[in-house]
Regions:
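SH3-family beta-barrel domains
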Residues: 26-73, 84-87, 93-97, 105-107, ...
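Short, surface-exposed beta-strand-loop junctions and turns on beta-sheet-rich folds
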Residues: 77-78, 109-111, 173-174
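Structural recognition of the beta-strand scaffold that forms the well-ordered cores
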Residues: 166, 175-176
Length: 190
């Protein structure tokens, strides 16, 4: 009798273990499904390109590539190359999306509109005959003045917003007003 009880008990334990195992598998699949679906949803959101910022500034090409700067059909290095722009050519920036800017009004051989990698462009300060131009903390002249750029000095271009250029000069990151910008490499714009 005891061996019959033990056998029933072992069988019952096996059934319970099987049920627990099946429930654990079902729970694991549900958890994986939730994680995968949430991950896919998050990836879809993350895969969207950065929002475009409208701009209206001029800059010049500073690439060291002998063939010039690639102009692309979209805001990434995977987009088709439409043409090239030589170093020191002036371009008009009409939009920005992350580290890419949409350009037009190009002074060189390439005519049309396209996208270029922002770190390959620069601007200079105006202010000829003054002690320099102000760098502002935000894209408006009522914001705090956080630094100065000497006249006719090349600065690193970080971005743009309307007619304002986001720049970096000697570690100071801020904004240059449109009247303080020079988008031509070989002139002081005075």
């Amino acid at each position: 009798m005891t061996s019959a009880i033990l056998l029933v008990s072992k069988n019952r334990r096996k059934q319970l273990n099987d049920q627990v195992f099946q429930q654990a598998i079902a729970l694991a699949f549900c958890s994986i499904s939730v994680l995968v679906n949430t991950g896919i949803a998050n990836q879809t959101v993350l895969a969207q390109p950065p929002k475009q910022q409208k701009c209206d500034i001029y800059a010049y090409v500073i690439t060291k590539e002998p063939q010039g700067l690639n102009v692309r059909s979209g805001a990434s290095p995977t987009h088709r190359i439409l043409g090239k722009i030589a170093t020191n050519e002036t371009v008009k920036i009409v939009a920005a999306s992350g580290k890419w800017v949409k350009i037009t009004d190009i002074t060189g051989d390439f005519k049309g509109t396209g996208w270029v990698y922002l770190p390959m462009l620069s601007i200079s300060s105006r202010g000829y005959g003054t002690d320099g131009v102000n760098i502002y903390s935000n894209a408006n002249q009522k914001s705090q003045k956080i630094g100065k750029v000497p006249p006719s000095t090349s600065v690193k271009l970080l971005g743009c917003q309307g007619e304002w250029a986001q720049v970096e000069y000697q570690g100071i990151k801020g904004w240059l007003a449109s009247e303080d910008q020079c988008g031509a490499a070989l002139t002081s714009c005075s």
